[in-house]
């Protein structure tokens, strides 16, 4: 869900004239805000500055046993969280990316909301960076359905570069480049998915730095 919100915002940021000409920009912002409002509610540690984020509501096996409307499932709905003792760097960093990209989409339209999104994004990225771990190791019910196959390194780069774009803070760009090099990401990738953000990170790094090593990888993307 966080990955979907990031990509929706990215589309609006990259092609605003297309959305405006189609009369769809307001609909796009509404769709993104539906997701980011939810993420803000899930970030339950925000008021105290603690690391606590609810990453899943519902049991996978139980939910998949019924293909009906949520309104017709007033049954067992357990909730699962990540926190300082049970981290989820991939989930926290991806959510930070979604909030940061959404802040850019709302910049100049609802500045108070954009600022709120940045505040939550920065806390979540700190959580991801300081308490390392795969979310599916902490929320074990997710393993059979949305396991973090690729780990969290790509999301740490992805989240940092989005925060740089949204805030202009050099520390985030420095961190994105440092982690990109540290994690050995200097090779081409074949796809962008909810679990693998390397291709997207390479695009953003190429745009923000203009460095040939990032640009070259995009010319051979396949």
Model regions and ranges:
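Glycan-recognition and catalytic cores of secretory/periplasmic carbohydrate-active enzymes
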Residues: 1-222
């Amino acid at each position: 869900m966080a990955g979907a919100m990031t990509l929706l915002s990215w589309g609006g940021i990259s092609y605003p004239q297309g959305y405006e000409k189609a009369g769809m920009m307001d609909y796009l912002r509404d769709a993104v805000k539906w997701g980011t409002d939810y993420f803000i509610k899930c970030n339950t540690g925000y008021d105290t500055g603690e690391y606590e984020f609810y990453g899943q509501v519902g049991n996978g096996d139980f939910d998949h046993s019924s293909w009906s409307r949520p309104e017709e499932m007033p049954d067992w709905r357990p909730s699962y969280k990540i926190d300082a003792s049970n981290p989820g760097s991939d989930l926290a960093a991806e959510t930070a990316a979604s909030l940061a990209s959404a802040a850019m989409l709302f910049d100049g339209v609802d500045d108070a909301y954009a600022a709120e999104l940045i505040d939550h994004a920065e806390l979540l990225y700190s959580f991801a960076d300081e308490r390392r771990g795969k979310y599916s190791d902490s929320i074990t019910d997710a393993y059979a359905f949305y396991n973090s196959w690729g780990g969290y390194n790509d999301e740490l780069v992805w989240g940092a570069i989005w925060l740089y774009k949204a805030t202009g803070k050099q520390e985030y760009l420095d961190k994105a480049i440092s982690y990109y090099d540290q994690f050995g990401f200097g090779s081409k990738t074949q796809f962008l998915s909810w679990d693998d953000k390397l291709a997207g990170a390479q695009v953003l790094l190429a745009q923000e730095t203009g460095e040939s090593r990032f640009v070259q990888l995009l010319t051979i993307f396949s």
